[in-house]
């Protein structure tokens, strides 16, 4: 039996809207068709396989990743206008596109691939492309002076394995906003059980805890975490993490203990469950 969800929640789950607020606005404006018919209520229940079309202007960003970062910058209140950024795992440029639209001064777009960056992003004079570069082996000299912000959207590698490189190009007090993908963080056996899809909330919880702990072990402070409003292209739940690189003025917690991030983990997992299951019908 298929799961039925509210239309606004289903639009977000499918990546057709970056947030439920935007989904509700699209529905109210008469831009959403369900099964070829105009949908008028965001509370309408729809099946997971039901055809849905959003009419109107094209996507805001060159890839779905842009909407993920946009939601994180809003939630975490990270101001990027005028800053220098290193975008790790730039790919087609979804994160970079979001940053450019928000007024960054410079982006160093790093990716292990070649020629993937969308021409709209790669053609912007504020973007310096660094292709064929494994982020794990990133030379800090690539950035010149340390950057103010590092963003990361990486696949087929654990974020924990590249944290040294990412923090190595970030100035003290600078921010890291990274996409956490459980399918690339959990063990192979765990991922294989779900045929590449990680659905167990306890695995999400473990993954977030391990990534946050790895950041803290490198002197960073965890500032926030959230469930991505859009799943990965394969349907996997993803998370966004905000950390700040420590500096000489940072002080340890009581008795030298690291800050307790369990509350952030619990909140992010609960948010992800809400996105996956949707609100309960009355």
Regions found by a protein language model. Give the residues of each.
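Short, glycine-/aromatic-enriched active-site segment of Class I SAM-dependent methyltransferases
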Residues: 182-199
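S-adenosyl-L-methionine
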Residues: 105-161
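A short glycine-rich, Lys/Arg-flanked "PGG" loop and its adjoining helix->strand segment in the class I
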Residues: 160-177
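Conserved S-adenosyl-L-methionine
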Residues: 98-106
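Conserved class I S-adenosyl-L-methionine
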Residues: 81-91, 99
């Amino acid at each position: 039996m298929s799961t039925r969800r509210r239309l606004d929640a289903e639009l977000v789950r499918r990546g057709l809207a970056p947030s439920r607020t935007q989904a509700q606005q699209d529905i109210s404006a008469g831009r959403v068709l369900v099964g070829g018919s105009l949908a008028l209520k965001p509370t309408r229940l729809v099946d997971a396989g039901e055809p849905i079309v959003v009419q109107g202007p094209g996507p805001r960003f060159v890839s779905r990743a842009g909407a993920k970062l946009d939601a994180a910058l809003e939630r975490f209140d990270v101001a990027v206008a005028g800053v220098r950024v290193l975008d790790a795992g730039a790919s087609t440029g979804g994160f970079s596109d979001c940053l450019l639209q928000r007024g960054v001064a410079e982006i160093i777009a790093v990716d292990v691939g070649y020629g993937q960056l969308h021409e709209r992003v790669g053609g912007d004079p504020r973007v310096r492309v660094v292709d064929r570069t494994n982020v794990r082996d990133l030379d800090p000299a690539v950035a010149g002076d340390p950057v103010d912000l590092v963003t990361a959207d990486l696949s087929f590698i654990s974020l924990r394995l590249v944290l040294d490189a990412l923090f190595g190009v970030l100035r003290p007090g600078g921010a890291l906003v990274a996409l956490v993908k459980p399918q690339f963080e959990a063990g192979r056996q765990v991922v294989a059980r779900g045929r590449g899809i990680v659905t167990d909330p306890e695995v999400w919880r473990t993954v977030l805890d391990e990534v946050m702990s790895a950041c803290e072990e490198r002197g960073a402070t965890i500032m926030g975490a959230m469930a991505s409003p859009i799943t990965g292209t394969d349907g996997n739940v993803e998370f966004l993490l905000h950390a700040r690189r420590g500096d000489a003025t940072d002080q340890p917690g009581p008795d030298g203990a690291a800050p307790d991030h369990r509350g952030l983990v619990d909140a992010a997992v609960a948010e992800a469950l809400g996105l996956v299951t949707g609100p309960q019908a009355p």
